[in-house]
A protein has these predicted regions:
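ATP/NTP-dependent adenylation/nucleotidyl-transfer catalytic domains that generate, transfer
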Residues: 1-144
């Protein structure tokens, strides 16, 4: 506020889809320029922009516990998860992805995480106690 600026988010599409973020913390910045990029695309962008390899190649981690990395906790690498997420978002089914040659265990891992963390990508339900409750059906008053 002192600088008249807004904080930027650093979350990416892979983390959001896999549910690997803190709910209502790193998923709720006012601006998130990387939010529609998969993790592997963020790495590609960083290389394109000249970010040093020592930063890009550092294993992704929430840095909450020493020597614990994202991919260890997820059970799959972003390099394997991102193509699966991409094709699921394009409308392919789990069975189609499995029959396409992708690892069945990888597809199952991604699908389980995607399904189990869907609730994290929804707005909270508001108890509608009045006709002016601010929830999913809220309409902004018209400015005259």
């Amino acid at each position: 506020a002192k600088l008249g600026a807004l904080p930027l988010g650093t979350g990416n599409k892979s983390e959001r889809l896999l549910g690997y973020y803190t709910w209502h913390a790193d998923d709720s910045p006012p601006i998130n320029p990387l939010g529609d990029l998969f993790k592997t695309q963020v790495w590609d962008l960083a290389r394109h922009l000249g970010v040093p390899d020592v930063i890009i190649d550092k294993p992704a981690s929430a840095d909450l516990i020493r020597d614990v990395h994202d991919e260890d906790e997820l059970g799959i690498s972003y390099h394997r998860a991102d193509p699966i997420l991409h094709w699921l978002l394009q409308g392919y089914t789990v069975d189609e992805l499995k029959s396409s040659g992708l690892s069945q265990s990888d597809v199952d891992c991604v699908w389980r995480r995607l399904s189990a963390t869907h609730w994290k990508r929804e707005l909270p339900t508001v108890a509608m106690l009045s006709s002016t409750a601010i929830g999913e059906f809220y309409l902004r008053p018209v400015d005259y």
